[in-house]
Amino acid sequence: MEFKHVLMILGVIILTLAPLIMYSGLGEDEGYFGGADGAAGDLIMEISPNYEPWFEPFWEPPSGEIESLLFALQAAIGALIIGYFFGYNKAKYDDQN
Amino acid sequence: MHIMEGFLPPMWAAIWFLLSGIVVIYGIIQLNKLIKDKPEVKPTLALAGAFMFILSSLKLPSVTGSCSHPTGGGLGAVMFGPAITAVLATIVLLFQAILLAHGGLTTLGANIFSMGIMGPAIGFLVFKLLKGKLNITWVVVLAAIFADWGTYVTTSIQLALAYPLPDFGTALANFGTVFAVTQIPLAIMEGLLTGLIWDYIMKLRPDLLAKLGLIEPAKAEGGAE
């Protein structure tokens, strides 16, 4: 791995950890770490209080746990494909060199 | 960044469906042509789609104290352009709308337009403009960052158009604050991750990138072919 790549990975880690450290001890009840999508929905209800969402999702994950399951599944599908691509090509690459 | 189900008035939902539909259909035609002409690039298509799957499932904390997730559209945009990326984004958005109630079916057109079309189009443009002027890794990083920012600015504009209260400018500023500010650090993160994965493809399969016309064929030697 090149030095550049180490710096890039460090950058990702720092950017992820910084908010958790900055707002350490604060949680959803204080209005932190909620989703931006929901915040936009709240803003719509605030500036246009009479607006009624005219369509409901057909199905919602019955709980936060199930939602995490499906999000994890989504990431796993992606990671499998990427891992396969890189694993397959890395083996071929090592074979040739 | 997703507009929630039911939160766009029917007229706007229809407009964005129409605009996105045209691009997605064009993208499907392009995609079929690409697969027919260069079947060997198929794995990179899967890779770009998979990258979007992962990144859009990572809800990350941002320095503004709210959470959002990257879109992953930058990689596809750089490799295949915005139209094909729109097709990939449609798959991801359908998954999220149907299984996660994240985004929505009525707002699908608008969400495809911001995440699958405008963001990637801006990333694609940045890539074209900077290519050859900087080290290609950083060009890709910047393209992904701008693709991500472009997405959030577009979503803010879409919401401000639908809810110009009290006027368009104020609404745009308000929605922009909710989305774009949260997204500034997340976009940088997405850019770095996109750059990392790009470099790894460059190391292992530069021939595939050369096939797509992204790098000089001369530089494509030494991969795993």
Swiss-Prot record, chain A:
GO terms for molecular function: cobalt ion transmembrane transporter activity. Keywords: Cell membrane, Cobalamin biosynthesis, Cobalt, Cobalt transport, Ion transport, Membrane, Transmembrane, Transmembrane helix, Transport. GO terms for biological process: cobalamin biosynthetic process. It is found in: Cell membrane. It is a multi-pass membrane protein. It holds the Pfam family CbiN. The chain crosses the membrane at residues 6-26, 68-88. The keyword Membrane applies. Its main location: membrane. GO terms for cellular component: plasma membrane. Pathway: Cofactor biosynthesis; adenosylcobalamin biosynthesis. Belongs to the CbiN family. Part of the energy-coupling factor (ECF) transporter complex CbiMNOQ involved in cobalt import. Forms an energy-coupling factor (ECF) transporter complex composed of an ATP-binding protein (A component, CbiO), a transmembrane protein (T component, CbiQ) and 2 possible substrate-capture proteins (S components, CbiM and CbiN) of unknown stoichimetry. This is Cobalt transport protein CbiN. The lineage of its organism: Archaea, Methanobacteriati, Methanobacteriota, Methanomada group, Methanococci. The gene is cbiN.
